Amino acid sequence: MIQVLLVTLCLAAFPYQGSSIILDSGNVNDYEVVYPRKVTALPKGAVQPKYEDTMQYEFKVNGEPVVLHLEKNKGLFSEDYSETHYSPDGREITTYPSIEDHCYYRGRIQNDADSTASISACNGLKGHFKLQGEMYLIEPLKLPDSEAHAVYKYENIEKEDEAPKMCGVTQTNWKSDEPIKKASQLVVTPEEQRYLNTKKYIELVIVADNVMVKKYTSNSTAIRTRIYACVNTLNLIYRAFNIYIALIGLEIWSNRDLINVQSASSVTLDLFGTWRETVLLRHKRHDNAQLLTGINFDGDTVGLAYVGSMCDPKRSAGIIQDHNKLDVMVAIAMAHELGHDLGINHDGNQCNCGGNPCIMSATLNFEPVYRFSDCSRDEHWRYLIDNRPPCILNKPSITDIVSPPVCGNYFVEVGEECDCGLPAHCQNPCCDAATCKLRPETQCEDGECCEQCQFTRAGTECRAARSECDIAESCTGQSAECPTDDFQRNGQPCLNNNGYCYNGTCPILTNQCISFFGSSATVAPDVCFDFNLQGQGNFYCRRERARIFPCAPQDKKCGRLFCVKGPIGNTISCQSTSSQSDLDIGMVDLGTKCGDGRVCNSNRQCVDVNTAY
Protein backbone atom coordinates (compact mmCIF):
# COMPACT_ATOMS: atom_id res chain seq x y z
CA MET A 1 0.00 0.00 0.00
CA ILE A 2 1.31 3.43 -0.94
CA GLN A 3 0.82 6.13 1.63
CA VAL A 4 0.88 9.72 0.42
CA LEU A 5 2.77 12.09 2.69
CA LEU A 6 2.03 15.78 2.21
CA VAL A 7 4.85 17.98 3.38
CA THR A 8 3.42 21.48 3.59
CA LEU A 9 6.10 24.13 3.65
CA CYS A 10 3.71 27.05 3.31
CA LEU A 11 0.49 27.63 1.43
CA ALA A 12 1.01 31.36 0.96
CA ALA A 13 2.02 33.08 -2.22
CA PHE A 14 2.72 36.77 -2.05
CA PRO A 15 1.87 39.12 -4.92
CA TYR A 16 4.45 40.75 -7.12
CA GLN A 17 6.79 43.05 -5.24
CA GLY A 18 6.93 46.73 -6.07
CA SER A 19 10.70 47.15 -5.84
CA SER A 20 13.45 45.35 -7.68
CA ILE A 21 15.68 42.72 -6.11
CA ILE A 22 19.20 41.51 -6.82
CA LEU A 23 19.25 37.76 -7.42
CA ASP A 24 21.87 35.36 -8.78
CA SER A 25 20.68 36.13 -12.30
CA GLY A 26 21.00 39.91 -11.80
CA ASN A 27 18.67 42.76 -11.00
CA VAL A 28 15.04 41.62 -11.34
CA ASN A 29 12.34 44.28 -11.61
CA ASP A 30 9.21 42.19 -11.25
CA TYR A 31 9.00 38.97 -9.28
CA GLU A 32 6.69 36.86 -7.16
CA VAL A 33 7.52 35.26 -3.80
CA VAL A 34 6.29 31.69 -3.45
CA TYR A 35 6.67 28.92 -0.88
CA PRO A 36 6.57 25.64 -2.84
CA ARG A 37 4.56 22.81 -1.31
CA LYS A 38 6.22 19.44 -1.75
CA VAL A 39 4.10 16.33 -2.27
CA THR A 40 5.92 13.04 -1.69
CA ALA A 41 4.63 9.53 -2.31
CA LEU A 42 6.58 6.91 -0.35
CA PRO A 43 5.81 3.34 0.70
CA LYS A 44 4.77 3.09 4.31
CA GLY A 45 7.81 2.92 6.56
CA ALA A 46 10.25 3.79 3.75
CA VAL A 47 13.23 5.99 4.47
CA GLN A 48 13.13 9.16 2.41
CA PRO A 49 16.36 9.64 0.41
CA LYS A 50 18.05 13.00 0.32
CA TYR A 51 17.09 13.50 -3.33
CA GLU A 52 14.18 11.38 -4.49
CA ASP A 53 13.96 9.95 -8.00
CA THR A 54 10.70 11.81 -8.61
CA MET A 55 9.28 14.84 -6.85
CA GLN A 56 6.27 17.09 -7.14
CA TYR A 57 5.91 20.70 -6.03
CA GLU A 58 2.85 22.92 -5.95
CA PHE A 59 2.85 26.73 -5.92
CA LYS A 60 1.08 29.61 -7.62
CA VAL A 61 2.18 31.74 -10.56
CA ASN A 62 0.12 34.83 -11.36
CA GLY A 63 -2.41 33.61 -8.84
CA GLU A 64 -2.94 30.31 -10.68
CA PRO A 65 -1.93 26.95 -9.16
CA VAL A 66 1.04 25.22 -10.78
CA VAL A 67 2.09 21.60 -10.27
CA LEU A 68 5.74 20.97 -11.13
CA HIS A 69 6.62 17.31 -11.79
CA LEU A 70 10.34 16.50 -11.55
CA GLU A 71 12.33 13.35 -12.29
CA LYS A 72 16.01 12.93 -11.57
CA ASN A 73 18.27 13.07 -14.63
CA LYS A 74 19.72 9.65 -13.92
CA GLY A 75 21.93 9.53 -16.99
CA LEU A 76 23.62 12.85 -16.27
CA PHE A 77 26.91 11.26 -15.21
CA SER A 78 28.74 8.17 -16.45
CA GLU A 79 30.11 5.52 -14.10
CA ASP A 80 33.71 6.60 -14.63
CA TYR A 81 32.96 10.31 -14.24
CA SER A 82 36.14 12.05 -13.13
CA GLU A 83 37.24 15.50 -12.09
CA THR A 84 40.73 16.79 -12.79
CA HIS A 85 42.42 19.85 -11.35
CA TYR A 86 46.02 20.93 -10.88
CA SER A 87 48.09 21.68 -7.80
CA PRO A 88 50.03 24.97 -7.47
CA ASP A 89 53.16 23.17 -8.69
CA GLY A 90 51.32 21.89 -11.77
CA ARG A 91 50.68 18.29 -10.70
CA GLU A 92 47.57 16.71 -12.20
CA ILE A 93 45.08 15.52 -9.58
CA THR A 94 42.21 13.32 -10.79
CA THR A 95 39.43 12.12 -8.52
CA TYR A 96 36.36 9.95 -9.08
CA PRO A 97 33.73 11.54 -6.82
CA SER A 98 30.65 9.62 -5.76
CA ILE A 99 27.67 11.41 -7.27
CA GLU A 100 24.99 8.75 -7.07
CA ASP A 101 22.59 10.94 -5.10
CA HIS A 102 22.81 14.09 -7.20
CA CYS A 103 20.18 16.82 -7.24
CA TYR A 104 19.57 17.66 -10.93
CA TYR A 105 16.11 17.14 -12.40
CA ARG A 106 14.14 17.58 -15.58
CA GLY A 107 10.41 17.96 -15.57
CA ARG A 108 7.16 19.44 -16.79
CA ILE A 109 4.14 21.40 -15.64
CA GLN A 110 0.96 19.40 -15.10
CA ASN A 111 -1.71 19.93 -17.79
CA ASP A 112 0.69 21.85 -20.07
CA ALA A 113 1.84 19.56 -22.89
CA ASP A 114 4.38 22.08 -24.21
CA SER A 115 6.00 22.71 -20.83
CA THR A 116 9.58 21.86 -19.85
CA ALA A 117 11.69 22.27 -16.73
CA SER A 118 15.35 22.04 -15.77
CA ILE A 119 15.80 22.31 -12.02
CA SER A 120 18.53 21.91 -9.41
CA ALA A 121 17.14 20.85 -6.03
CA CYS A 122 20.47 20.99 -4.21
CA ASN A 123 19.53 23.93 -1.98
CA GLY A 124 15.93 24.75 -2.68
CA LEU A 125 14.63 24.88 -6.25
CA LYS A 126 16.79 26.72 -8.77
CA GLY A 127 16.38 26.65 -12.53
CA HIS A 128 13.79 27.43 -15.14
CA PHE A 129 10.50 26.16 -16.47
CA LYS A 130 8.33 26.93 -19.46
CA LEU A 131 4.69 27.62 -18.64
CA GLN A 132 2.05 28.45 -21.27
CA GLY A 133 4.75 29.38 -23.76
CA GLU A 134 6.64 31.72 -21.42
CA MET A 135 9.97 31.17 -19.69
CA TYR A 136 10.08 31.54 -15.90
CA LEU A 137 13.00 31.27 -13.52
CA ILE A 138 12.91 30.16 -9.91
CA GLU A 139 15.53 30.45 -7.19
CA PRO A 140 15.62 30.49 -3.38
CA LEU A 141 15.64 33.85 -1.65
CA LYS A 142 18.61 34.19 0.68
CA LEU A 143 16.56 34.69 3.83
CA PRO A 144 17.41 33.07 7.18
CA ASP A 145 15.20 30.14 8.17
CA SER A 146 12.92 30.62 5.18
CA GLU A 147 11.75 28.47 2.29
CA ALA A 148 10.83 31.51 0.22
CA HIS A 149 11.57 31.42 -3.52
CA ALA A 150 11.44 34.08 -6.21
CA VAL A 151 9.63 33.31 -9.48
CA TYR A 152 10.05 35.74 -12.36
CA LYS A 153 9.99 35.97 -16.12
CA TYR A 154 13.23 36.13 -18.05
CA GLU A 155 12.11 39.41 -19.62
CA ASN A 156 12.11 41.06 -16.18
CA ILE A 157 15.85 40.67 -15.69
CA GLU A 158 17.81 43.86 -16.36
CA LYS A 159 20.25 43.09 -19.17
CA GLU A 160 23.79 44.32 -18.53
CA ASP A 161 24.83 44.01 -22.16
CA GLU A 162 22.27 44.49 -24.95
CA ALA A 163 24.72 43.77 -27.78
CA PRO A 164 23.69 40.71 -29.84
CA LYS A 165 25.77 37.61 -29.15
CA MET A 166 27.08 35.71 -32.13
CA CYS A 167 28.34 32.27 -33.01
CA GLY A 168 31.76 32.54 -34.65
CA VAL A 169 31.02 29.89 -37.29
CA THR A 170 30.79 31.55 -40.70
CA GLN A 171 29.60 30.52 -44.15
CA THR A 172 27.11 27.94 -42.91
CA ASN A 173 23.84 29.79 -43.49
CA TRP A 174 21.35 28.60 -46.09
CA LYS A 175 22.27 30.53 -49.23
CA SER A 176 18.90 30.38 -50.95
CA ASP A 177 15.45 28.86 -50.80
CA GLU A 178 16.63 25.81 -52.73
CA PRO A 179 18.56 24.03 -49.93
CA ILE A 180 15.59 24.51 -47.59
CA LYS A 181 13.28 22.97 -50.15
CA LYS A 182 15.59 20.01 -50.53
CA ALA A 183 15.92 19.59 -46.77
CA SER A 184 12.18 19.61 -46.21
CA GLN A 185 11.80 16.86 -48.83
CA LEU A 186 14.44 14.60 -47.32
CA VAL A 187 13.61 11.03 -48.33
CA VAL A 188 15.10 8.12 -46.41
CA THR A 189 15.10 4.37 -46.89
CA PRO A 190 13.65 2.01 -44.24
CA GLU A 191 17.21 1.15 -43.15
CA GLU A 192 18.06 4.84 -42.79
CA GLN A 193 14.86 5.50 -40.85
CA ARG A 194 15.70 2.72 -38.39
CA TYR A 195 19.12 4.29 -37.93
CA LEU A 196 17.63 7.74 -37.32
CA ASN A 197 15.18 6.31 -34.78
CA THR A 198 17.95 4.64 -32.79
CA LYS A 199 18.95 6.35 -29.55
CA LYS A 200 22.24 8.21 -29.67
CA TYR A 201 24.59 8.85 -26.73
CA ILE A 202 27.26 11.53 -26.32
CA GLU A 203 29.87 11.19 -23.58
CA LEU A 204 30.95 14.75 -22.87
CA VAL A 205 33.99 16.32 -21.21
CA ILE A 206 33.87 19.98 -20.17
CA VAL A 207 37.03 21.96 -19.46
CA ALA A 208 36.95 25.16 -17.39
CA ASP A 209 39.91 27.43 -18.12
CA ASN A 210 41.98 29.43 -15.64
CA VAL A 211 40.05 32.66 -16.27
CA MET A 212 36.92 30.78 -15.16
CA VAL A 213 38.77 29.75 -12.00
CA LYS A 214 39.65 33.37 -11.26
CA LYS A 215 36.16 34.57 -12.17
CA TYR A 216 34.69 32.26 -9.55
CA THR A 217 37.49 33.05 -7.04
CA SER A 218 38.88 29.51 -7.20
CA ASN A 219 35.57 28.14 -5.93
CA SER A 220 35.50 24.75 -7.61
CA THR A 221 32.08 24.01 -6.10
CA ALA A 222 30.60 27.06 -7.85
CA ILE A 223 32.19 26.04 -11.17
CA ARG A 224 31.01 22.46 -10.76
CA THR A 225 27.46 23.56 -9.91
CA ARG A 226 27.30 25.84 -12.95
CA ILE A 227 28.52 23.16 -15.33
CA TYR A 228 26.18 20.50 -13.91
CA ALA A 229 23.22 22.84 -14.43
CA CYS A 230 24.32 23.53 -18.02
CA VAL A 231 24.58 19.83 -18.87
CA ASN A 232 21.20 19.19 -17.25
CA THR A 233 19.64 21.74 -19.63
CA LEU A 234 21.69 20.38 -22.55
CA ASN A 235 20.03 17.00 -22.01
CA LEU A 236 16.61 18.62 -22.04
CA ILE A 237 17.30 20.35 -25.36
CA TYR A 238 18.73 17.31 -27.16
CA ARG A 239 15.92 14.98 -26.15
CA ALA A 240 14.18 16.28 -29.30
CA PHE A 241 16.83 14.48 -31.38
CA ASN A 242 16.70 11.29 -29.27
CA ILE A 243 20.22 12.12 -28.05
CA TYR A 244 21.25 11.50 -24.45
CA ILE A 245 24.26 13.34 -23.02
CA ALA A 246 26.31 11.99 -20.11
CA LEU A 247 29.01 14.09 -18.44
CA ILE A 248 32.01 11.78 -18.31
CA GLY A 249 34.61 14.27 -17.13
CA LEU A 250 35.20 17.77 -15.78
CA GLU A 251 38.65 19.31 -16.00
CA ILE A 252 39.46 22.57 -14.20
CA TRP A 253 42.66 24.36 -15.17
CA SER A 254 43.14 25.55 -11.61
CA ASN A 255 46.85 26.34 -11.82
CA ARG A 256 47.26 27.64 -15.38
CA ASP A 257 45.82 27.18 -18.85
CA LEU A 258 47.15 24.17 -20.74
CA ILE A 259 46.72 25.99 -24.05
CA ASN A 260 47.03 29.64 -24.99
CA VAL A 261 43.39 30.68 -24.51
CA GLN A 262 43.02 33.96 -26.35
CA SER A 263 40.40 36.36 -27.63
CA ALA A 264 40.81 35.12 -31.22
CA SER A 265 38.19 32.37 -31.07
CA SER A 266 39.38 30.51 -34.19
CA VAL A 267 42.90 30.21 -32.82
CA THR A 268 41.64 29.08 -29.42
CA LEU A 269 39.41 26.43 -31.02
CA ASP A 270 42.30 25.11 -33.09
CA LEU A 271 44.57 24.90 -30.04
CA PHE A 272 41.88 23.28 -27.92
CA GLY A 273 41.13 20.69 -30.61
CA THR A 274 44.82 19.83 -30.90
CA TRP A 275 45.11 19.51 -27.10
CA ARG A 276 42.04 17.28 -27.04
CA GLU A 277 43.53 14.98 -29.68
CA THR A 278 47.06 14.81 -28.30
CA VAL A 279 46.47 14.99 -24.53
CA LEU A 280 42.89 14.60 -23.33
CA LEU A 281 41.89 11.59 -25.46
CA ARG A 282 44.96 9.70 -24.31
CA HIS A 283 43.82 9.61 -20.69
CA LYS A 284 40.04 10.09 -20.89
CA ARG A 285 37.70 8.25 -23.25
CA HIS A 286 34.95 10.56 -24.52
CA ASP A 287 33.03 11.61 -27.65
CA ASN A 288 33.10 15.41 -27.49
CA ALA A 289 34.81 18.14 -25.46
CA GLN A 290 33.72 21.72 -24.79
CA LEU A 291 35.95 24.47 -23.37
CA LEU A 292 34.12 26.90 -21.08
CA THR A 293 36.18 30.06 -20.81
CA GLY A 294 35.95 33.28 -18.86
CA ILE A 295 37.80 35.23 -21.55
CA ASN A 296 35.93 37.63 -23.83
CA PHE A 297 36.24 36.63 -27.47
CA ASP A 298 36.77 39.31 -30.10
CA GLY A 299 33.65 41.16 -31.23
CA ASP A 300 30.31 39.73 -30.13
CA THR A 301 31.34 36.08 -30.53
CA VAL A 302 30.48 33.83 -27.59
CA GLY A 303 31.05 30.41 -29.16
CA LEU A 304 32.68 28.50 -31.98
CA ALA A 305 32.81 24.87 -33.12
CA TYR A 306 33.74 22.77 -36.09
CA VAL A 307 30.85 21.75 -38.35
CA GLY A 308 30.06 18.08 -38.93
CA SER A 309 32.90 16.86 -36.74
CA MET A 310 31.38 14.53 -34.13
CA CYS A 311 33.75 11.67 -33.17
CA ASP A 312 36.74 13.27 -34.94
CA PRO A 313 39.80 13.15 -32.63
CA LYS A 314 40.61 16.84 -33.05
CA ARG A 315 37.47 18.48 -34.36
CA SER A 316 34.78 16.99 -32.10
CA ALA A 317 35.05 20.07 -29.91
CA GLY A 318 33.69 23.53 -29.23
CA ILE A 319 34.50 26.61 -27.17
CA ILE A 320 31.98 28.65 -25.17
CA GLN A 321 32.36 32.02 -23.46
CA ASP A 322 30.82 32.17 -19.98
CA HIS A 323 28.90 35.21 -21.16
CA ASN A 324 25.78 35.31 -19.01
CA LYS A 325 24.89 35.00 -15.33
CA LEU A 326 22.12 32.57 -16.21
CA ASP A 327 23.09 28.91 -16.54
CA VAL A 328 20.39 28.42 -19.16
CA MET A 329 21.86 31.02 -21.53
CA VAL A 330 25.32 29.43 -21.37
CA ALA A 331 23.71 26.01 -21.86
CA ILE A 332 21.91 27.26 -24.98
CA ALA A 333 25.20 28.55 -26.41
CA MET A 334 26.73 25.13 -25.70
CA ALA A 335 23.76 23.41 -27.35
CA HIS A 336 24.26 25.64 -30.40
CA GLU A 337 27.95 24.77 -30.77
CA LEU A 338 27.28 21.08 -30.15
CA GLY A 339 24.72 21.36 -32.94
CA HIS A 340 27.50 22.41 -35.30
CA ASP A 341 29.54 19.36 -34.23
CA LEU A 342 26.46 17.30 -35.15
CA GLY A 343 26.38 18.70 -38.68
CA ILE A 344 23.80 21.48 -38.25
CA ASN A 345 24.24 24.79 -40.06
CA HIS A 346 22.94 28.20 -39.04
CA ASP A 347 19.27 28.79 -39.71
CA GLY A 348 18.15 30.97 -42.58
CA ASN A 349 15.15 33.30 -42.52
CA GLN A 350 12.77 30.62 -43.77
CA CYS A 351 13.64 28.07 -41.09
CA ASN A 352 10.89 27.55 -38.55
CA CYS A 353 10.62 26.19 -35.02
CA GLY A 354 7.10 27.23 -34.16
CA GLY A 355 7.33 31.00 -34.20
CA ASN A 356 10.04 31.32 -31.54
CA PRO A 357 13.75 32.02 -32.00
CA CYS A 358 15.52 28.75 -32.74
CA ILE A 359 18.63 27.14 -31.27
CA MET A 360 20.72 27.41 -34.46
CA SER A 361 20.13 31.09 -35.22
CA ALA A 362 23.49 32.73 -35.96
CA THR A 363 22.59 35.40 -33.40
CA LEU A 364 22.03 34.09 -29.89
CA ASN A 365 18.78 35.67 -28.79
CA PHE A 366 17.99 37.62 -25.63
CA GLU A 367 15.62 34.94 -24.42
CA PRO A 368 16.07 31.25 -23.68
CA VAL A 369 15.15 28.98 -26.59
CA TYR A 370 14.76 25.22 -26.58
CA ARG A 371 13.70 24.29 -30.08
CA PHE A 372 15.54 23.29 -33.21
CA SER A 373 14.09 24.41 -36.52
CA ASP A 374 12.84 22.18 -39.32
CA CYS A 375 16.05 23.05 -41.20
CA SER A 376 18.17 21.94 -38.23
CA ARG A 377 16.30 18.64 -37.99
CA ASP A 378 16.78 17.78 -41.65
CA GLU A 379 20.37 19.02 -41.71
CA HIS A 380 21.15 16.83 -38.69
CA TRP A 381 19.43 13.82 -40.24
CA ARG A 382 21.31 14.28 -43.49
CA TYR A 383 24.60 14.51 -41.59
CA LEU A 384 23.85 11.32 -39.64
CA ILE A 385 22.87 9.40 -42.78
CA ASP A 386 25.88 10.57 -44.78
CA ASN A 387 28.51 10.25 -42.05
CA ARG A 388 27.26 7.71 -39.49
CA PRO A 389 29.49 9.05 -36.65
CA PRO A 390 30.30 5.80 -34.82
CA CYS A 391 30.93 7.04 -31.29
CA ILE A 392 27.36 8.20 -30.63
CA LEU A 393 25.92 4.71 -31.13
CA ASN A 394 27.91 3.31 -28.21
CA LYS A 395 25.27 2.66 -25.59
CA PRO A 396 26.53 3.09 -22.03
CA SER A 397 26.85 -0.31 -20.41
CA ILE A 398 24.02 -1.11 -18.01
CA THR A 399 26.64 -0.79 -15.26
CA ASP A 400 27.92 2.55 -16.55
CA ILE A 401 25.14 4.69 -15.08
CA VAL A 402 26.27 6.18 -11.79
CA SER A 403 22.93 6.39 -9.99
CA PRO A 404 20.98 3.37 -8.72
CA PRO A 405 18.71 1.91 -11.42
CA VAL A 406 15.26 3.44 -11.70
CA CYS A 407 12.56 2.55 -14.19
CA GLY A 408 11.47 5.53 -16.27
CA ASN A 409 14.72 7.45 -16.88
CA TYR A 410 15.22 6.37 -20.54
CA PHE A 411 18.45 4.48 -19.73
CA VAL A 412 18.48 0.67 -19.70
CA GLU A 413 20.09 -0.29 -16.40
CA VAL A 414 20.72 -3.42 -14.34
CA GLY A 415 17.55 -5.52 -14.15
CA GLU A 416 15.82 -3.72 -17.05
CA GLU A 417 15.16 -4.89 -20.61
CA CYS A 418 13.97 -1.53 -21.88
CA ASP A 419 13.20 1.97 -20.60
CA CYS A 420 10.88 4.31 -22.48
CA GLY A 421 10.34 6.84 -19.70
CA LEU A 422 7.45 7.19 -17.30
CA PRO A 423 4.14 5.52 -18.28
CA ALA A 424 2.60 8.91 -19.07
CA HIS A 425 5.41 9.66 -21.55
CA CYS A 426 6.20 6.26 -23.06
CA GLN A 427 5.41 5.97 -26.76
CA ASN A 428 7.17 2.67 -27.37
CA PRO A 429 4.75 -0.23 -27.97
CA CYS A 430 7.48 -2.79 -27.28
CA CYS A 431 8.20 -1.76 -23.69
CA ASP A 432 6.07 -2.00 -20.55
CA ALA A 433 6.82 1.38 -18.96
CA ALA A 434 5.60 0.24 -15.54
CA THR A 435 8.12 -2.63 -15.27
CA CYS A 436 10.81 -1.69 -17.83
CA LYS A 437 10.45 -5.18 -19.28
CA LEU A 438 9.71 -6.09 -22.88
CA ARG A 439 6.08 -6.90 -23.52
CA PRO A 440 5.17 -10.56 -24.17
CA GLU A 441 6.10 -11.86 -27.63
CA THR A 442 8.53 -8.98 -28.25
CA GLN A 443 12.30 -9.29 -28.74
CA CYS A 444 13.53 -5.69 -28.72
CA GLU A 445 12.49 -2.07 -28.31
CA ASP A 446 15.14 -0.10 -30.19
CA GLY A 447 18.01 -0.50 -32.61
CA GLU A 448 18.93 -0.56 -36.27
CA CYS A 449 17.96 -4.24 -36.42
CA CYS A 450 14.71 -3.92 -34.48
CA GLU A 451 11.48 -3.55 -36.43
CA GLN A 452 8.00 -3.71 -34.94
CA CYS A 453 9.43 -5.11 -31.69
CA GLN A 454 11.14 -8.06 -33.44
CA PHE A 455 14.71 -8.70 -34.53
CA THR A 456 15.06 -7.83 -38.20
CA ARG A 457 15.48 -10.85 -40.50
CA ALA A 458 19.07 -12.08 -40.83
CA GLY A 459 20.77 -10.71 -43.93
CA THR A 460 18.79 -7.46 -43.98
CA GLU A 461 21.18 -4.64 -44.74
CA CYS A 462 21.42 -2.26 -41.79
CA ARG A 463 24.33 -0.11 -42.91
CA ALA A 464 24.97 0.46 -46.61
CA ALA A 465 28.46 0.68 -48.07
CA ARG A 466 29.28 4.34 -48.62
CA SER A 467 32.06 3.70 -51.14
CA GLU A 468 34.04 0.88 -52.69
CA CYS A 469 36.30 1.13 -49.64
CA ASP A 470 33.42 0.47 -47.25
CA ILE A 471 31.66 -2.80 -46.44
CA ALA A 472 27.89 -3.13 -46.05
CA GLU A 473 26.72 -4.60 -42.73
CA SER A 474 23.66 -6.82 -42.30
CA CYS A 475 21.51 -7.81 -39.34
CA THR A 476 22.28 -11.16 -37.72
CA GLY A 477 18.69 -11.97 -36.77
CA GLN A 478 19.86 -12.47 -33.17
CA SER A 479 20.37 -8.89 -32.05
CA ALA A 480 18.76 -5.46 -32.32
CA GLU A 481 22.15 -3.88 -33.00
CA CYS A 482 23.80 -3.51 -36.39
CA PRO A 483 27.24 -5.17 -36.38
CA THR A 484 30.27 -2.94 -35.88
CA ASP A 485 31.04 -0.73 -38.87
CA ASP A 486 33.83 -2.29 -40.92
CA PHE A 487 35.61 -1.31 -44.12
CA GLN A 488 38.17 -2.53 -46.62
CA ARG A 489 41.78 -2.62 -45.46
CA ASN A 490 43.64 0.68 -45.58
CA GLY A 491 45.96 0.87 -48.58
CA GLN A 492 43.79 -1.19 -50.94
CA PRO A 493 43.73 0.43 -54.42
CA CYS A 494 40.46 2.17 -55.33
CA LEU A 495 38.90 4.33 -58.07
CA ASN A 496 40.77 2.53 -60.85
CA ASN A 497 44.09 2.77 -58.99
CA ASN A 498 43.79 6.55 -58.67
CA GLY A 499 43.75 6.26 -54.88
CA TYR A 500 44.08 4.00 -51.87
CA CYS A 501 41.42 3.15 -49.31
CA TYR A 502 41.63 5.01 -46.00
CA ASN A 503 39.14 4.38 -43.18
CA GLY A 504 36.34 3.45 -45.58
CA THR A 505 36.89 6.26 -48.10
CA CYS A 506 38.98 6.72 -51.25
CA PRO A 507 40.54 10.18 -50.92
CA ILE A 508 41.96 11.58 -54.17
CA LEU A 509 43.01 15.13 -55.04
CA THR A 510 40.52 15.49 -57.90
CA ASN A 511 37.47 14.82 -55.74
CA GLN A 512 38.76 17.17 -53.07
CA CYS A 513 39.06 19.96 -55.66
CA ILE A 514 35.53 19.27 -56.91
CA SER A 515 34.15 19.48 -53.37
CA PHE A 516 35.67 22.95 -52.92
CA PHE A 517 35.39 24.50 -56.39
CA GLY A 518 32.69 22.60 -58.27
CA SER A 519 32.44 19.90 -60.91
CA SER A 520 34.73 21.64 -63.42
CA ALA A 521 37.65 21.87 -60.98
CA THR A 522 40.82 19.85 -61.52
CA VAL A 523 44.08 19.38 -59.65
CA ALA A 524 46.55 22.23 -60.21
CA PRO A 525 49.92 21.62 -61.88
CA ASP A 526 52.80 20.53 -59.64
CA VAL A 527 54.33 24.01 -59.73
CA CYS A 528 51.41 25.31 -57.65
CA PHE A 529 52.23 22.89 -54.85
CA ASP A 530 55.69 24.50 -54.62
CA PHE A 531 54.03 27.19 -52.48
CA ASN A 532 53.94 24.59 -49.71
CA LEU A 533 57.74 24.60 -49.66
CA GLN A 534 57.71 28.17 -48.34
CA GLY A 535 56.15 27.53 -44.95
CA GLN A 536 54.49 30.95 -44.93
CA GLY A 537 50.90 32.08 -44.44
CA ASN A 538 48.54 29.24 -45.33
CA PHE A 539 51.13 27.27 -47.28
CA TYR A 540 52.82 24.57 -45.22
CA CYS A 541 52.67 20.91 -44.23
CA ARG A 542 52.62 20.91 -40.45
CA ARG A 543 51.52 23.30 -37.75
CA GLU A 544 52.36 23.08 -34.05
CA ARG A 545 50.75 25.75 -31.89
CA ALA A 546 51.75 29.05 -33.52
CA ARG A 547 54.60 27.57 -35.61
CA ILE A 548 54.23 26.35 -39.17
CA PHE A 549 56.64 24.06 -40.97
CA PRO A 550 57.26 24.00 -44.74
CA CYS A 551 56.83 20.82 -46.72
CA ALA A 552 59.86 18.85 -47.79
CA PRO A 553 59.95 18.61 -51.61
CA GLN A 554 58.70 15.01 -51.58
CA ASP A 555 55.80 15.96 -49.25
CA LYS A 556 54.47 19.04 -51.04
CA LYS A 557 51.26 17.29 -52.16
CA CYS A 558 50.37 16.54 -48.53
CA GLY A 559 50.09 20.21 -47.49
CA ARG A 560 47.71 22.86 -48.84
CA LEU A 561 45.48 21.65 -51.70
CA PHE A 562 45.78 23.52 -55.01
CA CYS A 563 43.21 23.34 -57.77
CA VAL A 564 42.33 24.90 -61.11
CA LYS A 565 38.73 25.93 -61.68
CA GLY A 566 37.78 25.40 -65.30
CA PRO A 567 39.95 24.79 -68.38
CA ILE A 568 43.66 25.59 -68.12
CA GLY A 569 44.73 28.28 -70.60
CA ASN A 570 48.10 29.89 -71.15
CA THR A 571 48.07 31.30 -67.61
CA ILE A 572 48.29 29.02 -64.59
CA SER A 573 45.87 29.99 -61.81
CA CYS A 574 46.68 28.27 -58.52
CA GLN A 575 43.58 28.23 -56.33
CA SER A 576 43.43 27.18 -52.70
CA THR A 577 41.00 27.65 -49.83
CA SER A 578 41.31 28.20 -46.09
CA SER A 579 39.16 29.10 -43.09
CA GLN A 580 39.94 31.06 -39.95
CA SER A 581 37.45 28.98 -37.97
CA ASP A 582 38.96 25.65 -39.10
CA LEU A 583 42.62 25.78 -40.04
CA ASP A 584 42.52 22.23 -41.45
CA ILE A 585 40.03 23.16 -44.16
CA GLY A 586 41.77 23.26 -47.52
CA MET A 587 44.57 20.88 -46.55
CA VAL A 588 45.03 17.64 -48.49
CA ASP A 589 43.06 14.84 -46.79
CA LEU A 590 44.98 12.19 -44.88
CA GLY A 591 45.38 8.95 -46.84
CA THR A 592 45.41 10.78 -50.20
CA LYS A 593 47.60 9.32 -52.93
CA CYS A 594 50.65 11.58 -53.35
CA GLY A 595 52.62 9.41 -55.76
CA ASP A 596 52.78 5.87 -57.10
CA GLY A 597 52.50 3.58 -54.10
CA ARG A 598 52.60 6.53 -51.69
CA VAL A 599 50.05 8.24 -49.40
CA CYS A 600 49.90 11.21 -47.03
CA ASN A 601 50.21 10.15 -43.39
CA SER A 602 49.12 11.97 -40.22
CA ASN A 603 52.38 13.96 -40.16
CA ARG A 604 51.65 15.13 -43.73
CA GLN A 605 54.53 13.14 -45.11
CA CYS A 606 54.30 11.27 -48.41
CA VAL A 607 55.20 7.71 -47.38
CA ASP A 608 55.12 4.18 -48.79
CA VAL A 609 51.56 2.82 -48.67
CA ASN A 610 52.86 -0.55 -47.43
CA THR A 611 54.32 1.01 -44.28
CA ALA A 612 51.74 3.76 -43.71
CA TYR A 613 49.11 1.55 -42.02
From Swiss-Prot:
Required cofactors, per record?
Zn(2+)
Could you name the Gene Ontology cellular component terms for this entry?
Answer: extracellular region; plasma membrane
> SUPFAM superfamilies per the record?
Blood coagulation inhibitor (disintegrin), Metalloproteases ('zincins'), catalytic domain
Q: Where is the active site?
A: E337
Which ranges of residues are annotated as propeptide in this record? Answer: 21-190
Q: What positions does the record give for glycosylation?
A: N219, N503
- Which processes are annotated in GO (biological process)? proteolysis
| The record's free-text note on cofactor binding | Binds 1 zinc ion per subunit.
Q: Which tissues is this protein detected in according to the database?
A: Expressed by the venom gland.
Enzyme Commission code: 3.4.24.-
S-S bonds: C311-C391, C351-C375, C353-C358, C407-C436, C418-C431, C420-C426, C430-C453, C444-C450, C449-C475, C462-C482, C469-C501, C494-C506, C513-C563, C528-C574, C541-C551, C558-C600, C594-C606
Pinpoint motif D/ECD-tripeptide by residue range: 468-470
User: Which positions are annotated as binding Zn(2+)?
Assistant: H336, H340, H346
Any one Pfam family here would be ADAM_CR
Entry's family note: Belongs to the venom metalloproteinase (M12B) family. P-III subfamily. P-IIIa sub-subfamily.
Binding partners and assembly: Monomer.
Q: Please describe what this protein does.
A: Snake venom metalloproteinase that impairs hemostasis in the envenomed animal.
Among PANTHER family, the record links this protein to:
ADAM A DISINTEGRIN AND METALLOPROTEASE DOMAIN, DISINTEGRIN AND METALLOPROTEINASE DOMAIN-CONTAINING PROTEIN 28
Q: What is this protein called?
A: Zinc metalloproteinase-disintegrin-like VMP-III
The species is: Agkistrodon piscivorus leucostoma (Western cottonmouth)
